[in-house]
Amino acid sequence: MKRALLCVSFGTTVENGRTDLMAVENALQASAPDYRFARALTSRIIRKRLASRGEHADSLPEALETLLAEGYTHVAVQPTHLLYGYEYDKIRAEIAPYTHRFERLALGRPLLADTDDLQKAAEILCNTYPEQNGEALVMMGHGTEHFAGIVYPAMQSVFALQGRSDVFVATVEGWPALQQILPQIQRAGYRRVHLVPLLLVAGDHACHDMAGAEPESWKSQLQAVSISVRCTLEGLGRVPGIQAMYCNKLKEILV
């Protein structure tokens, strides 16, 4: 029996974001020391950009073909995605043709797969970002039109139930958007905001859409209504408790 761990991510070309991703990959690799470690990136655009810099990254089918050619029989595929959604569905579809080509091919769950995960992640993030007097903590999620996007407002509810009414969750490409939670922030009387990514990596979205100098960035939009802003450019991948959650997901599918 030859066993492999295949870590699947969307990918990023931002160096700071790659540090976040590598932290999760290292944690997963350490939790399965007897497995051959491999990685795949699902974003064709990211793979193309990396290739233009002389860096090759496998797609998911390419990585699976390589493992087959090397004689691996048992493969654990662990995504670093945050939730079920279109990207996760894509992974499921791409591994389906390989299910009977390995003795065992198992797909792990995303980070926020059930209500226990939401509560655990919120607890970890509450400890990572303690409440600051007079300051709102605003988290930027990616967002999706997939029904799984309900996770974002659910997370804000979980924070509130854990006593953190200062935490607000919005998305850059989905619902709720910043402008939909801004009235809540203003009604609560906050004049200071701490922006942090609710993203695995602090990549393009965090650097530009959240903390950028452009007028449409979240930082600029908040400053335009006389709210002072500070930003943290560290993705969830750098948080030890979040790394541990991913490792627990992996353990569910190891043999």
PLM segments and residue spans:
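Active-site-proximal alpha-helix that buttresses catalytic centers in soluble enzyme cores
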Residues: M1-V255
